Swiss-Prot record:
It catalyses: S-methyl-5'-thioadenosine + phosphate = 5-(methylsulfanyl)-alpha-D-ribose 1-phosphate + adenine. Pfam families: PNP_UDP_1. GO terms for biological process: L-methionine salvage from methylthioadenosine; purine ribonucleoside salvage. GO terms for molecular function: S-methyl-5-thioadenosine phosphorylase activity. Catalyzes the reversible phosphorylation of S-methyl-5'-thioadenosine (MTA) to adenine and 5-methylthioribose-1-phosphate. Involved in the breakdown of MTA, a major by-product of polyamine biosynthesis. Responsible for the first step in the methionine salvage pathway after MTA has been generated from S-adenosylmethionine. Has broad substrate specificity with 6-aminopurine nucleosides as preferred substrates. CDD domains: MTAP_SsMTAPII_like_MTIP. Homohexamer. Dimer of a homotrimer. Keywords: Glycosyltransferase, Purine salvage, Transferase. This is S-methyl-5'-thioadenosine phosphorylase. It is an enzyme of class 2 (transferase). The lineage of its organism: Bacteria, Pseudomonadati, Spirochaetota, Spirochaetia, Leptospirales.
Length: 287
């Protein structure tokens, strides 16, 4: 791929395109992990070259466990992406996080069960640090932009990622609250883990659509409820992104550069050649 796109936007439920983007090209590349969720749009947005990828595909035909995260992140890495801003709907586990509120999580609890969450294994072992799953630098820029446009946004919250595609039971919802989780979704993992291994700064912007099912007297979450509130939030998300784009992709967060090089532990002579061949697409300088 001949583009040098530094910024990627991953759209979640209800965000399948980016209004105002001047399209240059659509690509649907092959990667060693298959094809991405859908065609990646490359274009200018507010004068900046970006890539846009709908996580669930246009028309929402991929459930959370089916999203080809490995291919998605690999394809964006090949474009030159250094920063990813991902959007997602979430359920609120806290009274103060109301439906339609925006949230910037800083921590994740992994409750997925059947998802491969690494590019490594099968003869090449690596252990990437993940204590801070999101980019503090990127999060700070998003928070500052939200303040600039007068958008109240909840900061430093804990996001629990469940397997899905079914929503939580009441017992699970109360359990997550007791653990200190503030919001819940089905898509931050393994997306965030793979972005970390690929040395891409990553932050998810969460939009609360419901109170999950823990709140007494409140209707339990439904798809209709999620979509209705996402539609209401669309204009706010566009307003935030139209300002945020100016502080993205300017080389402000290169803290992950070369980090994976020092996470690989397998001796060169013991590495599986087939795995090395795949990893070379992501890390040509390491293999």
């Amino acid at each position: 791929m001949s583009y040098n796109v530094r910024v990627a936007i991953i759209g979640g439920t209800g965000l399948y395109s980016l209004e105002g983007m001047e399209l240059i090209e659509e690509i649907f590349p092959d990667t060693p992990w298959g094809k991405p969720s859908d065609k990646i749009k490359i274009g200018k947005y507010k004068g900046k070259l970006i890539a846009f990828l709908p996580r669930h595909g246009i028309g929402h035909f991929l459930s959370p466990p089916e999203v080809p995260n490995h291919a998605n992140i690999c394809a964006l890495k090949q474009l030159g992406v250094e920063e990813i801003v991902a959007f997602s709907s979430v359920g609120s586990l806290r009274e103060e996080i109301k439906p339609l509120d925006f949230v910037l999580p800083s921590q994740i609890i992994d409750r997925t069960r059947f998802r491969n969450s690494t590019y490594f294994g099968n003869g090449v072992v690596a252990h990437a640090p993940f204590a801070e799953p999101f980019s503090p630098n990127l999060s700070k820029r998003i928070a500052q932009t939200a303040k600039k446009i007068g958008l109240e946004i909840h900061l430093d919250k804990t996001l629990v990622c469940m397997e899905g595609p079914l929503f939580s039971t009441k017992a699970e919802s109360h359990l997550y609250r007791s653990w200190g989780a503030d919001i819940i979704n089905m898509t931050v993992l393994p997306e965030a883990k793979l972005a970390r291994e690929a040395e891409i700064a990553y932050q998810m912007i969460c939009m609360s659509t419901d109170y999950d099912c823990w709140r007494e007297g409140e209707e339990s979450v439904t798809v209709e409820m999620v979509i209705a509130n996402l539609t209401k939030n669309a204009e706010t998300a566009k307003k935030l992104l139209s300002e945020l784009i100016h502080v993205l992709g300017n080389g402000d967060d290169l803290s992950l550069k070369n980090s994976t090089r020092y996470s690989i532990i397998t001796a060169p002579e013991k590495r599986n050649p087939e795995t090395v061949k795949k990893l070379r697409v992501l890390f040509p300088e390491y293999f």
